[in-house]
Amino acid sequence: MTWLESIILAIVEGVTEFLPVSSTGHMIITSALMGIKSDPFTKVFEVAIQFGAILSVVVLYFKRFFKSCDFYFKLFVAFIPTAIVGLLLKKHIDTWLENVWVVASTLLVGGIVLLFVDKWFQKNETEGEEEVSYQTGFLIGCFQCLAMIPGVSRSAATIIGGLTQKLTRKAAAEFSFFLAVPTMFAATAKSLYDEKELILESTDKIPLLLLGNVVAFIVAMLAIKFFINILTKYGFKAFGYYRIALGALLLILLAMHVDLQVV
């Protein structure tokens, strides 16, 4: 992996991780365009730079993270469903992750769903709740389990979950960001621990990992601010059309037998 490739992948990670557009789908397209082949270090790199994205949430919402213990208890309750389902379905999840057809199909279907989300939950903006209860947090965590299917988008699943519990778009999006911290931290830490031998053997590539995290951190902060602004003003429809276009593009490329891989 070159320095330029690491920067571009980190930018893609930072932009897409917290938007309801599926970071996995974008990594597939980006890697195909740049000719990046799947290898052990590339997989470790894409996992490791998620730490930078996670940190951006903590920095942006610093006061919320250190406000009260109740905040952490709610995140813990919301994290429980994902932890349980993740442990039970790990082998199946690993298999799904290798299937680009699954990613393309879920991108397309998820995009169609997003086209109707604003209409379904229109009253939330005037009558919705701003505070997340324990029950709401748990149910959002259940929705997050859907994101284990590649292409669904963790952000899209959890925000829609929040909307079903009568949260405003902003409140649902922010709790989605908060829930990403324990969820992504646990998944990333576990993946890196499993690859600890490879990391120890690749000390010469540590600068690439550090650069990737810095870039992902900066870009993710900007993406979160952009997303909240767009979401509160215009809703989900634009993201829906974008997902449909991306999913269709992936399906066309697959039909043309273009070599696409989940790197």
From Swiss-Prot:
GO MF term list: undecaprenyl-diphosphatase activity
Membrane topology: Multi-pass membrane protein
Keyword Oxidoreductase: no
EC code(s) of this entry: 3.6.1.27
Reaction(s) this enzyme catalyzes, per UniProt: di-trans,octa-cis-undecaprenyl diphosphate + H2O = di-trans,octa-cis-undecaprenyl phosphate + phosphate + H(+)
One GO term (biological process): response to antibiotic
Major localisation: membrane
Localisation per UniProt entry: Cell inner membrane
A GO cellular component annotation in the UniProt record: plasma membrane
Record keywords, A-Z: Antibiotic resistance, Cell inner membrane, Cell membrane, Cell shape, Cell wall biogenesis/degradation, Hydrolase, Membrane, Peptidoglycan synthesis, Transmembrane, Transmembrane helix
Residue intervals passing through the bilayer: 1-21, 41-61, 69-89, 97-117, 132-152, 172-192, 208-228, 238-258
InterPro entries found in the cross-reference section: UppP
Domain of life: Bacteria
Pfam families to which the protein is assigned, alphabetical: BacA
Top EC class, one word: hydrolase
Keyword Transmembrane: yes
Family the UniProt entry places it in: Belongs to the UppP family.
Alphabetized HAMAP family for the sequence: Undec_diphosphatase (MF_01006)
Additional remarks: Bacitracin is thought to be involved in the inhibition of peptidoglycan synthesis by sequestering undecaprenyl diphosphate, thereby reducing the pool of lipid carrier available.
Functional note: Catalyzes the dephosphorylation of undecaprenyl diphosphate (UPP). Confers resistance to bacitracin.
Name of the protein: Undecaprenyl-diphosphatase
Naturally occurring in which organism (per UniProt): Cytophaga hutchinsonii (strain ATCC 33406 / DSM 1761 / CIP 103989 / NBRC 15051 / NCIMB 9469 / D465)
Lineage of producing organism: Bacteria, Pseudomonadati, Bacteroidota, Cytophagia, Cytophagales
